[in-house]
Every structure is written in C-alpha cells, then in structure tokens.
Amino acid sequence: MTDGLPERFDVLVHPVSELRGELRAQPSKNYTTRYLLAAALAEGETRVVGAATSEDAEALIRCLRAWGADVDRVGEDVVVRGFGAHPRAGMTLNPGNAGAVARFLMGVAALTTDTTFVTDYSESLGRRPQGDLLAALERLGARVSSRNGQLPVTLSGPVRGGRVEVSAQRSSQYASALMFLGPLLPDGLDLRLTGEIKSHAPLRQTLDTLAAFGLQARASADLTRITIPGGQAYRPGRVLVPGDYPGSAALLVAAALLPGEVTVTNLREGDLQGEREALNVLRAMGADLVREGDRVTVRGGRPLHAVTRDGDSFTDAVQALTAAAAFARGTTTWENVATLRLKECDRISDTRRELERLGLTATETADSLSITGADRIPGDLTADGHGDHRMIMLLTLLGLRAEAPLRITGAHHIRKSYPLFFRHLEELGAHFEYLPTDAA
C-alpha cells in the first residue's frame, strides 16, 4: 500500500502529551468524485489537479475505465480522456463501498443498456437504500431491476429527460446523480426535489462542478427545483481539487484536544463544502482557532464547552466533533442528523455504543445524538471501528487523549476517504502501532 501500512490492520493508539506542526489538507473526496465523473463525461482530455487517492476515488476510476474512459495518474494529478455521452453498454461495475460513486454512476447508466452494479460490501453499501433514485430513473423511462431497491441493480436507457421528482429525504446524492445525467439528455431535466432536503452543500458542489465543465443549470434558492437544458456537452479542461474539510476537521479537533499548535493549509475560505462549518462549531466550543486565508491554526489545550447544533450541513464532520464533545463541559447535541444512520454503519447508535464502552454518557433519538463530556477516558480496551472511516477517526481522537492505549479494529478502512490519516497525525507527534489482522 502507498501508506506503507499492512493491507488489513487494527491500530493501537497511544496517548500523547501534545501535537505540533503544519500539514496540507488532503484533496477533497467529494470534489474528486465529481470532477473525475464530469471529466469522463467530456469528450477530450481533462486534467484533475491534486486528486484524492482514497479507495472511493480508485473505485470510481476502475468503473470509468470499464465504461471506456482512459484514466491515468500523473504525479498528484489524474488525466482523463472521456467517453462523453457514450459509456460502454453491458458492463458490470463494482463501486466498492462508495455510496456516492454508486449513485452518481447509476444516474449516468441511463445513457447505456444493461449496466449492472454489484458490491463486495453486502453488509454496508449492499444495505444502503437506492430506491428513491431508481424510482426517478424509471419515471424518466429507464428500465430498472434491483433487490428491493438495493444492490445488485441493473439499468438500461435510453431516456429523453423532462420533468421528474426525486426524494431528497434520505440523501442529496440521488439528485446529484440526475444532475450529472441531465445535460446529456435530449430534453434536459426539470428536477423537483421533494421532502426535506438533506445536505444542501453537496448539491451546490454538483452545480459548481457542472459550471466548471461549461454546463448551464439553474436552481431555485432553496434547491427544490433545478433546471438543466438538454443537448449540452461537458467541456474538457483543467480543474483543481480543493482541500478536504471533513478529514481536516479531524486534524483540527485533535489539535484542540491536546496542548500544542497545529496549522492545516489548503482550506479554501469560501469553499462550498458544508463541513467548513465545523471550524465555527469548534470555535463556539471554545477552541483557539484562527484563519488566515487558506491556513487554519489551532492552539490546543483550552477547556471546551458543550453546544447544540443542527448537524445536517456538516454530517461528515459530526464524528470528529463528537470527539471534542467527549471532553467538553456539559452535554453536546447534534440535531437533525438522521442521515448518519445510512452511512457505512449507523453513526448514531454505533457511536453511542462505542462511547458507552469507553465510559462516556451518550443518548440518542431517531435523528439526534447527545454526548456528555468527561474529564478523562481510561482507555486500555478495544473499540470497534465498524468498518467506517469516520468512526475510526473519532475513536483515534479519543485514544490520543485517553489514559492508556486504545485498540481500534479494522483501522484499514480509513483508506476509504483519508489514506494518510495516521501518517499525518504521526507528523504532528502521534504514536500508533499497526497490528496486522485477517479480518475484513
């Protein structure tokens, strides 16, 4: 592996007294996914500058190659020669455990015939709901077969486009999938989002991506209606992937929990990633956090206090911020986060259980998680990473402040979004032991 770690491993997190140093934020997972797909939908060559190297990115690249794109890593960039509006028919695609990749590709699969989606992660991605997207594609005229709205799924076009509704109650990814498809349809797309929209920020990232590739799209202020003219073409070119706020939030929380000073660069101030709000939440909790342009510095060790926040806009930072809540005075509540139950694991119930295992008090409702802070965590036990990269980040941060080492199972799943997470923390002064395992 490029990180120099075992293929599969548990990690033993040792407590540390301080963290200090400067890191460049890893490339955004969300933007890498969007830019690579858009590049494949363009005819011609696109350079995606500073693309992520996560398992999700690699899963997408494999699928795009199967569909006929020529994709090459050149240093830190990815060069894509796309298939335009004509991905290969009759292919079987395996998006690994990448939910956004699977959904975006399912939308585009309406340009093909007999594209089948499978996964090796039957207990994770295989259980995640796809029915709302599949129903919208059927309403557009696609032929769809699935296992009760879950993978495996087979899709066939063609579709012409027009007006269609899609539920945004469970995920905004369904709408994004249709938005990537829309410009290539003869009649375009008049997309109506129904239900309470979850995660506005990713929808704005998709609109931003379409604009970067020369496409026209109009959206109402509340994003309930998105209109995309048909007969357009994705324009190849050069796009720069911004820094990743969800992963960087974990670094900044770690910095806040321990004495020292940590700076993370490459965090664009006006970025559309919703997890940018994590910086404001951390500051509201009492962290000494200062921004200078794209540089964010945290001077750690200050006492933190509890907050109550609607977490819908920064769901991918909730686990990292939960580590801050675990040591904050009072009870922190993340509200309106029901979508966390539909991730790689149930990030509400599974988080509560892991916090209780560590001696903390946590409670949950259908759409909220509350954490009562403590002065200390004993450590000296094994926590379950639940095969979830965000859970692994949370548990790692807790382990850095524990009184004795904390073992986390299945820590190799960190590679889904942040392959260098442990290595970056080591650069700041953390100490880990990597324990090879045969477990999946």
Swiss-Prot record:
Gene Ontology molecular function terms on file: 3-phosphoshikimate 1-carboxyvinyltransferase activity
Annotated Gene Ontology cellular component terms: cytoplasm
Stored SUPFAM superfamilies: EPT/RTPC-like
A biological process term (GO) from this entry: aromatic amino acid family biosynthetic process
Primary localization: cytoplasm
Binding site for phosphoenolpyruvate: 29, 99, 128, 173, 347, 390, 416
Keywords per UniProt: Amino-acid biosynthesis, Aromatic amino acid biosynthesis, Cytoplasm, Transferase
One of the Pfam families matching this protein, by short name: EPSP_synthase
Catalytic activity, as annotated: 3-phosphoshikimate + phosphoenolpyruvate = 5-O-(1-carboxyvinyl)-3-phosphoshikimate + phosphate
Alphabetical list of InterPro entries matching this protein: Enolpyruvate_Tfrase_dom, Enolpyruvate_Tfrase_sf, EPSP_synthase, EPSP_synthase_CS, RNA3'P_cycl/enolpyr_Trfase_a/b
PANTHER family recorded: AROM/DEHYDROQUINATE SYNTHASE (PTHR21090), PENTAFUNCTIONAL AROM POLYPEPTIDE (PTHR21090:SF5)
Record note on quaternary structure: Monomer.
Name of the protein: 3-phosphoshikimate 1-carboxyvinyltransferase
Source organism of the structure: Deinococcus geothermalis (strain DSM 11300 / CIP 105573 / AG-3a)
